[in-house]
């Protein structure tokens, strides 16, 4: 089960309604009460939180989500498919007529310049930020050892001040070589996660 609070995006009908004063959104304390009720009800029926916004019965967690949030490389094939591999992230074009018109042999020889509608090369900093953002979004949190193995640098030399501050505030829990959100930290996770962007 995935449960999210509504985020009103620019350019959407909800944003227009909000600006016109016709969209009533719950106050922050009401949202917190809804979140608490959600946790209570999911636990009552045997669902456990395994990511910031996802709940499942033990053994039924979404494997796709787990792979994505764990930073496991993935390859997507076909119309609109997304991939992330060796610091490169790309997605295929979404237009079916354009997709059918491609000369795939030529595309593959040339590195897929038309097939890959979007392409991004991630810097090491981008990858570190993503490690923190995605890893902390899981209830298992992040591993200092995995960070060191992946980036060849100690996590505290990059994020030490932030990790210490949120641990001292009771928003992160540091156990062994892992950091994870406390229950209170989960409630304000969007704010905390944005602080792990290094720019």
Name each model feature, range by range.
Residues 152-167:
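Short amphipathic alpha-helical interaction segments
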Residues 167-177:
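A short, conserved structural fragment
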Residues 184-199:
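Short, amphipathic alpha-helical interaction segments positioned at domain boundaries
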Residues 178-182:
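Minor-groove-contacting beta-hairpin "wing" of winged helix-turn-helix DNA-binding domains
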Residues 1-153:
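C-terminal scaffold of the Radical SAM
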């Amino acid at each position: 089960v995935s449960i999210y609070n509504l985020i009103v995006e620019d350019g959407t009908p909800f944003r227009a309604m909000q600006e016109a004063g016709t969209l009533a959104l719950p106050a922050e304390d009401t949202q917190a009460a809804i979140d608490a009720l959600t946790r209570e009800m999911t636990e009552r029926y045997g669902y456990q939180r395994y990511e910031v916004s996802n709940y499942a019965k033990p053994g039924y967690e979404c494997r796709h989500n787990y792979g994505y949030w764990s930073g496991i490389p993935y390859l997507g094939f076909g119309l609109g498919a997304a991939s992330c591999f060796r610091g490169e992230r790309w997605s295929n074009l979404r237009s079916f007529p354009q997709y059918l018109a491609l000369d795939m042999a030529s595309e593959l020889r040339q590195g897929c310049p038309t097939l890959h509608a979007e392409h991004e090369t991630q810097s090491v900093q981008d990858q570190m930020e993503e490690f923190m953002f995605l890893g902390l979004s899981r209830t298992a949190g992040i591993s200092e050892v995995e960070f060191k193995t992946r980036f060849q640098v100690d996590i505290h030399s990059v994020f030490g001040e932030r990790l210490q501050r949120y641990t001292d505030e009771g928003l992160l829990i540091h156990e062994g070589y892992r950091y994870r959100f406390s229950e209170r930290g989960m409630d304000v996770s969007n704010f905390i996660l944005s602080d792990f962007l290094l720019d």
